[in-house]
Regions:
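Active-site beta-loop-alpha junctions enriched in small/polar residues
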Residues: 71, 99, 129-133, 160
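Anion (oxyanion) recognition and catalysis
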Residues: 8, 34, 115-119, 149
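Conserved N-terminal subdomain of the carbohydrate kinase-like
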Residues: 13-96
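Conserved phosphate/ATP/ADP-binding segment of small-molecule kinases
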Residues: 120, 134-182
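Short beta-strand/loop segments at the ligand-binding rim of alpha/beta enzyme cores
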Residues: 121-128
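Alpha-helix C-terminal capping segments
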Residues: 2-13, 58
Length: 182
């Protein structure tokens, strides 16, 4: 939601589509998103699965380390039928990340939304947002991120993600590889 919050602060209308558990954490997250002025009509609640929890620790060098309580998490359970297509079709830019493709159910919902956004003429924005503990394998992560790269008009990517996708430590060389491939 960081991208949405920043766009909202710049005066743009934003909306979030996703799923949280019908629990205190889910309500807290939705309230925090609403406080940023982000439309939450696309949020769905799951009575049977808890909200995914993420814990972030900052190391002395400033690097972040993530731990997750998930598997399943409510975000993984968003189905294509639950995607609010009116929000998608009204978007000028549709932003997504790879975490919405870690499981088949939410991957189908993501692909459904992207197809609708493209059909409506929206630009597609993608943030790989690689969180290694959430993937079954790094091959699966690479495959899904590669698909996301092939779909996007706008890319928000980190140095680590460039290296992960290209094998290049040099950012300029890695970026060139991404441009050439996608």
């Amino acid at each position: 939601c960081n991208v949405l919050a920043m766009l909202q602060k710049l005066g743009h209308q934003t909306a979030f589509i996703g799923k949280v558990g019908q629990d205190a954490f889910g309500r807290l997250l939705v309230d925090a998103v609403k406080e940023q002025g982000i439309d939450t009509t696309g949020v769905r609640y799951d009575d049977n699965v808890h909200t995914t929890l993420a814990f972030v620790q900052t190391a002395a060098d400033g690097d972040r380390d993530f731990s997750f309580y998930r598997n399943p998490g409510a975000d993984m359970m968003l189905t294509a039928d639950e995607v609010d297509l009116s929000l998608v079709r009204n978007a000028k830019i549709f932003h997504f990340g790879s975490l919405s493709m870690t499981d088949k159910i939410c991957e189908n919902a993501t692909k459904h939304a992207i197809a609708a956004a493209k059909e409506a003429g929206a630009l597609i924005s993608f943030d790989p947002n690689l969180r290694k503990p959430l993937w079954k394998s790094m091959d699966d992560a690479k495959e899904k991120i590669s698909w996301g790269l092939s779909q996007c008009d706008i890319l928000k990517i980190s140095d680590d993600e460039i290296e992960f996708m290209t094998g290049e430590k040099d950012i300029k060389t890695g970026v060139k590889k991404l441009i050439d491939e996608y």
